[in-house]
Amino acid sequence: MSDSTWMSADPHLASSLSPSQDERMRSPQNLHSQEDDDSSSESGSGNGSSTLNPSTSSSTQGDPAFPEMNGNGAVAPMDFTTAAEDQPINLCDKLPPATALGTPSYPSDGCGADGLRSRVKYGVKTTPESPPYSSGSYDSIKTEVSGCPEDLTVGRAPTADDDDDDHDDHEDNDKMNDSEGMDPERLKAFNMFVRLFVDENLDRMVPISKQPKEKIQAIIESCSRQFPEFQERARKRIRTYHKSCRRMKKNGMEMTRPTPPHLTSAMAENILAAACESETRKAAKRMRLEIYQSSQDEPIALDKQHSRDSAAITHSTYSLPASSYSQDPVYANGGLNYSYRGYGALSSNLQPPASLQTGNHSNGPTDLSMKGGASTTSTTPTPTPSSTSTSRPVPTAQLSPTEISAVRQLIAGYRESAAFLLRSADELENLILQQN
């Protein structure tokens, strides 16, 4: 390049310098370099325009360092490198890369004092540039590595709604391995117990979250009663087996899969049969108690309601017999009093005939008239209580609708228990046939 080219390019470079770059050129580091330098070419105004004047170039021609550095004795390339000393600092300010590309190669500096100072400057200024790039690359690697688990969790988020987790596939083996200190035969019986109850009470094609909560709770309570040592894992075992059934159905496998050989044994089958029989007896006992309690509560409510109705009828229709009921000594020798005591449960039903008898003797409160009235009238109305007593036991022998429904539930429970025992017997028989 000619000197005119450097002259035409330098004003553009001078105009592109910002005030912040001027301050950097006036920094203590640059001032220190200006004091050590014998020439006045680097101590200009900082815009690089004065270094291209002929007077300045003539003043620096006597310095032997400049011919060594520039090679051709021209001052302009050295001035360009002097202006380029600010380029590493300008890189921190994120200047366009075109400016950085315009810097000449540093080995062009000679072995003079200015060349050494420029190398020291570039060496010092390049050190703060490398940590941002190295740390930036390290941060980017950290960001990429830390982003990987987040991407995995985001990818697995939709599978949580499926209600079919893949990590439960090997739950049967896990249950067998983590049973330290427990009877393995009882653990096998517990697993088969859960399988039987889930097959009997739950729909295996419906997700476990949509199953009736009362049925699941009933199975858990049954497991807690028969296998108290495994009550903490009952819910998880039910969930695992139900999901495995759903997966097998989705994969096109048979619903009624046989029990794996490593999960069953003759002793476990015996424990299972005993647990099923015990649970059946306890279920029947609970149903009988519920029926008994419901049957006891209902007659009490019916008696209270009937007594209220009869008392209301007596007080509204027959006002005088209310005072005659308080005269108990009058009926001491009469046979009617025995009918009240003999039919204590039917006393409320016999109140209207008694009111009819005492209504005839409301005018004569004396003992003779009452005895005569009682003796004369006792022959006529006596068939009435007997007729009522014979006609009343028919409704009492009938069952209420609630009792009938309770009995039907008991019958259904017996049939279900019988079917369950029948299936257990068939499975035991098949097991014997398989072993033989």
From Swiss-Prot:
It holds the Pfam family HTH_NOL4_2nd. Residues 41-61, 375-396 have a biased composition (Low complexity). Residues 170-184 have a biased composition (Basic and acidic residues). Residues 160-169 have a biased composition (Acidic residues). The modification Phosphoserine is found at residues 130, 295. Residues 1-184, 351-400 are annotated as: Disordered. Keywords: Phosphoprotein. It comes from the Eukaryota. Residues 351-366 have a biased composition (Polar residues). PANTHER family: DEATH DOMAIN-CONTAINING PROTEIN (PTHR12449), NUCLEOLAR PROTEIN 4 (PTHR12449:SF22). This is Nucleolar protein 4-like. It comes from Pongo abelii.
